[in-house]
Curated annotation (Swiss-Prot):
Belongs to the Mediator complex subunit 6 family. It comes from Candida albicans (strain SC5314 / ATCC MYA-2876). It is found in: Nucleus. Residues 164-200 have a biased composition (Low complexity). Component of the Mediator complex, a coactivator involved in the regulated transcription of nearly all RNA polymerase II-dependent genes. Mediator functions as a bridge to convey information from gene-specific regulatory proteins to the basal RNA polymerase II transcription machinery. Mediator is recruited to promoters by direct interactions with regulatory proteins and serves as a scaffold for the assembly of a functional preinitiation complex with RNA polymerase II and the general transcription factors. This is Mediator of RNA polymerase II transcription subunit 6.
């Protein structure tokens, strides 16, 4: 069975034949599925059909009808609010005595359509659920907009909504070596290594920037021993780069001070 709070009901035939006003709105409501046929309203309507009633002068039918309902106890439907020509609120309540009632449900009529008013619990539940879903979607969006890279030193944010992306790690990784190479080019002096006859010294030279030479480990050991065991306590900073007793001579390399080193 369909829930009553999801139903919209109307009767075009009744509206076309009799119209809709405050005097007959309860009768119109009694045709809807929201109406309780065991209510006091149904009892009075059955009595009015078979009994002749006299309405006091200056009293409308719905006022007289509701005054009769106040004399009874049980379930009843009354007009709680009126805003003619197209809005009424019908209230279902349980009357305990002429002065005390307990509200059970409200219904409202807009134009010719009858609706069941939602409960406060349902309204709050719906609003809270919508709020939680919105917060969840926002959190997911924030998670999609951030990424963590060790090279960046933390989180970076990307505006994925507009499809733009930034790669600071790559740009910085490219720019830093270029600046380092620039400084190296400005201060490095090209060196050409010279290998003495009978010696084999593999080397790799790239554009005059960096030089890597493989020399037998025994040569370095000899040089280190000469420095450490020297009776004059000479430090390595005092050994000349070129000439007699120089580092190049101890390594078994020949060099020209003006032109550099050569194999």
């Amino acid at each position: 069975m369909e829930s009553l709070d999801e139903i919209q009901w109307k009767s075009p035939e009744f509206i076309q034949e009799r119209g809709l006003n405050t005097n007959n709105v309860l009768e119109y409501f009694s045709l809807s599925p929201f109406y309780d046929r065991t209510s006091n309203n149904q009892v009075l309507m059955m009595q009015f059909q078979y009994q002749q009633i006299q309405i006091p002068p200056g009293v409308s039918f719905h006022q007289y009808f509701q005054s009769r309902l106040s004399e009874m106890t049980g379930i009843e439907f009354v007009i709680a609010y009126t805003k003619e020509p197209d809005f009424w609120i019908i209230r279902k309540q349980k009357r305990q005595d002429p002065q005390n009632t307990v509200t059970l449900q409200d219904y409202y009529i807009i134009g010719a359509n009858v609706y069941q008013a939602p409960r406060i619990y349902d309204v709050l539940s719906s609003r809270l659920l919508a709020s939680v879903l919105s917060i969840k979607n926002s959190t997911d969006l924030l998670n999609d907009m951030t990424s963590y890279h060790i090279s960046d030193g933390g989180h970076s944010y990307i505006n994925s909504i507009h499809g733009s992306s930034s790669k600071p790690s790559q740009s910085s990784a490219v720019s830093k070596p270029s600046s380092t190479n620039t400084g190296t080019n400005a201060t490095t002096t090209p060196i050409t290594l010279t290998t003495p006859s009978g010696a084999t010294v593999p080397s790799t030279v790239s554009n005059g920037i960096s030089t890597s030479t493989e020399i037998a480990s025994g040569v370095f050991d000899t040089l280190l021993n000469d420095v450490v065991m020297n009776d004059d306590h000479l430090y390595i900073d005092e050994i000349p780069l070129y000439g007699e007793g120089s580092t190049l001579e101890r390594l078994g390399l020949k060099g020209n001070k003006d032109a550099g080193l050569s194999l």
